Swiss-Prot record:
An MF annotation (GO) of this entry: copper ion binding
Name this protein carries in UniProt: PF03932 family protein CutC
UniProt keyword annotations, A-Z: Cytoplasm
Pfam families per record: CutC
Family, similarity comment: Belongs to the CutC family.
Subcellular location per the Swiss-Prot or TrEMBL entry: Cytoplasm
InterPro entries, A to Z: CutC-like, CutC-like_dom_sf
TM region positions: none
HAMAP family named among the record's database cross-references: CutC
GO cellular component, one term: cytoplasm
């Protein structure tokens, strides 16, 4: 199977850079420092107008755990309807029980809303209690792929688990490695695990055009983020990653 590179895009501009670099598809997210949250309808619409490659949108109403209230599930269902109406090809979500298991009721509601779309179970998988059992549940539910770091802080650290999951999957579901994937380790991961799907942001920082600055003021309060630069996917880095994967 051909190698696939999914770019975690934080904006419509990053989506355009991903396509220019030759990415297979993008996952469009807001709130990347929080692990990704659902982007605005405006961001989705602009992204869709800019690129032709598939766009998968994360359906995650907030940061934190993956146990959701009935109100949050209702909002997620609504977001899936918006994503579909804007012509996106797929959605990315995952709901867990308080015990770290597969939340049958919550996931079933979202799956029903997303019927006919591409379905990715996101890194909620990495904090589940029993990953091999969870994988079988995802296969039975009809997910097309699972995004995972191998239940480790980074995909490189979880490469043995990723390889084991890939062997268990036997082609029934795609195993897509994500978290900390860089130009310097993507080939190692591919050769060690045997997987063919990779997820990376491949971003660089673009300096702010602001000339007047108050660097001591942070919009995140006590959370210090550089307010005078913004990360954006680099088409050149994407192209390099694609070349590496095609050479394997």
């Amino acid at each position: 199977m051909a190698m696939q590179l999914e770019i975690c895009a934080n904006s419509a501009a990053s989506c355009r850079q991903a396509e220019l670099g030759g990415a297979t598809r993008v996952e469009l997210c807001a709130g990347i420092p929080e692990g990704g949250t659902t982007p605005s309808a405006g961001e989705m619409a602009v992204a869709r107008s800019l690129i032709a490659i598939p766009i998968h949108v994360i359906i995650r109403p907030r940061a934190g755990d993956f146990v959701y209230s009935s109100e949050e599930i209702e909002a997620m269902c609504y977001d899936i309807r918006v994503v579909r109406s804007l012509g996106m090809e797929g959605v990315v979500f995952g709901c867990l029980t308080p015990e770290g298991g597969y939340d049958e009721e919550a996931n079933s509601r979202l799956l029903k809303e997303a019927q006919g779309m591409q379905l990715t179970f996101h890194r909620a998988f990495d904090v589940c209690a029993a990953p091999f059992e969870m994988l079988e549940k995802l296969i039975a539910a009809g997910f097309h792929r699972v995004l995972t770091s191998g239940c480790a802080p980074t995909a490189l650290e979880g490469k043995d688990m990723i390889g084991a999951l890939n062997k268990q999957a036997t082609g029934r579901i795609g195993i897509m490695a994500g978290c900390g994937i860089r130009l310097g380790n993507i080939e190692t991961l591919a050769r060690h695990t045997g997987i063919t799907q990779f997820h990376s942001s491949l971003r660089h920082d673009i300096p702010s055009s602001m000339r007047f600055r108050r660097p001591e003021v942070s919009m995140g309060g006590t959370v210090k983020i550089d307010e005078y630069s913004r990360p954006e996917t680099s088409a050149d880095m994407v192209r390099q990653a694609v070349d590496i994967l095609q050479g394997i």
